[in-house]
């Protein structure tokens, strides 16, 4: 990628069908972990008109009223009106949940003579960049903030005619590798049927777009697409089927970094798809926060049942202050990338996952997002032989 380029990322609201599914899956995970931190959980959710289906594998001593929990999540998201076509009181809740395969458990569980292994093979990436205050790419950061603002003005009745389903997309222009302008903004939001499109466009511009995007990035040629197809009354699970794990680029870096392919929601931290991706973010963010690179991407890989990663590699895109081989050595010295080690380091055996299931797993400032800490930055600078700021 050259130093001058255009880049676009998208996000979706908590009321988008796929995000409803992610939040239900993680709500179930949290409810189980609250009672049984060592549980093995892999829960998938499907949502469609009048229906929520849970399926997967769970091994636990906990008991959860999944029907009540599903209805609570759907209600909190904002599907509380039968006129929308999907609501918390009338939707059916179906479950098809079994136990984790003993063949998998044999390799993952910790015994006296067996260290906890990875829950599956796979490759995971972590990424950070110094272009925003949260060390995330600007396009995905502001795409998230747009749909977060949509939910805020909907729930606080600033724009009471908004409905839960929404999508955003932001196109940034980069020069010398840094974001300098917004070239296009797309905001599609579900709404009540009796609102004029002109009123929707004006309100979205004032209460959402101008509220979120820094004015210095907006210019006379910035293009705005607000509900570009016109009416957006039919939305949510009525308009589209929703499934857990279908928004993995929204969940991570908006396409700016590579992705190993594994989804996060509904998975307990023994699944390295989730926990190692969180650790990858933690490592990359601390490298950037330490000033060892302006951009950093780390890849780790695992074999099922094996504790040690099968590989660790780092790319700094020409922005590193020390060699990438040295960075890998520092990572091996200061971060425990074995499944048990990263679970312990990030304190992942807690009911902290539902908030991750909307508006991105990374770049968040809530205290439960332990992988967003930069507490290793000074240690890395010192180990690299650089003065501590």
From Swiss-Prot:
Biological process terms in GO annotation: one-carbon metabolic process; S-adenosylmethionine biosynthetic process
SUPFAM superfamilies: S-adenosylmethionine synthetase
Pathway: Amino-acid biosynthesis; S-adenosyl-L-methionine biosynthesis; S-adenosyl-L-methionine from L-methionine: step 1/1
Cofactor(s) of this protein: Mg(2+); K(+)
UniProt KW keywords: ATP-binding, Cytoplasm, Magnesium, Metal-binding, Nucleotide-binding, One-carbon metabolism, Potassium, Transferase
Residues reported to bind L-methionine: 57, 100, 240, 271
Residue ranges, annotated region (Flexible loop): 100-110
Locations listed in the record: Cytoplasm
GO function terms (MF aspect): ATP binding; magnesium ion binding; methionine adenosyltransferase activity
Key word Transferase present: yes
InterPro entries the UniProt entry points to: ADOMET_SYNTHASE_CS (IPR022631), S-AdoMet_synt_C (IPR022630), S-AdoMet_synt_central (IPR022629), S-AdoMet_synt_N (IPR022628), S-AdoMet_synthetase (IPR002133), S-AdoMet_synthetase_sfam (IPR022636)
Subunit: Homotetramer; dimer of dimers.
Protein task: Catalyzes the formation of S-adenosylmethionine (AdoMet) from methionine and ATP. The overall synthetic reaction is composed of two sequential steps, AdoMet formation and the subsequent tripolyphosphate hydrolysis which occurs prior to release of AdoMet from the enzyme.
Protein name (database record): S-adenosylmethionine synthase
Organism expressing this protein natively: Methylococcus capsulatus (strain ATCC 33009 / NCIMB 11132 / Bath)
